């Protein structure tokens, strides 16, 4: 086989394969195969739905953004541990270097 005939032979083989692929018998068998898989594709689509999962640690109810109950005031508004009058009612707010109250944070 000469090198000049090789491209012609390759084009002839691909054209013959294309004609065979477009034959009515082959198209009919492809349609029949794809229609028989139609029922299977519906089953696959149904199985892709996620199952119900248990509620996770970070899944919070809708009303979680509401503020929790505020801490009770000290008697006579004086902290019995630090003897501070009118101070914070919870743990020391500056223990991490910033003051946080009702979602507002002020860095010292």
Swiss-Prot record:
Its main location: mitochondrion. Residues 52-87, 95-108 have a biased composition (Basic and acidic residues). Keywords: Chaperone, Mitochondrion, Transit peptide. The keyword Mitochondrion applies. GO terms for cellular component: mitochondrial matrix; mitochondrion. The keyword S-adenosyl-L-methionine does not apply. Signal peptide: none annotated. It comes from the Eukaryota. Residues 31-108 are annotated as: Disordered. It holds the Pfam family DUF1674. GO terms for biological process: cellular respiration; innate immune response; mitochondrial respiratory chain complex II assembly; tricarboxylic acid cycle. Residues 1-20 form a transit peptide. Interacts with SDHA in its FAD-bound form. Plays an essential role in the assembly of succinate dehydrogenase (SDH), an enzyme complex (also referred to as respiratory complex II) that is a component of both the tricarboxylic acid (TCA) cycle and the mitochondrial electron transport chain, and which couples the oxidation of succinate to fumarate with the reduction of ubiquinone (coenzyme Q) to ubiquinol. Binds to the flavoprotein subunit SDHA in its FAD-bound form, blocking the generation of excess reactive oxygen species (ROS) and facilitating its assembly with the iron-sulfur protein subunit SDHB into the SDH catalytic dimer. Belongs to the SDHAF4 family. This is Succinate dehydrogenase assembly factor 4, mitochondrial. It comes from Homo sapiens (Human). The gene is SDHAF4.
């Amino acid at each position: 086989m000469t090198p000049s005939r090789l491209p012609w032979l390759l084009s002839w083989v691909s054209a013959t394969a294309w004609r065979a692929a477009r034959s009515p018998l082959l198209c009919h068998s492809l349609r029949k195969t794809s229609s028989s898989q139609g029922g299977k594709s519906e089953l696959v689509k149904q199985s892709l739905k996620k199952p119900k999962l248990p509620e996770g640690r970070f899944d919070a109810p809708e009303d979680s953004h509401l503020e929790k109950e505020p801490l009770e005031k000290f008697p006579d508004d004086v902290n019995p541990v630090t003897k501070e009058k009118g101070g914070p009612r919870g743990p020391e707010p500056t223990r991490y270097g910033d003051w946080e109250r009702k979602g507002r944070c002020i860095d010292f």
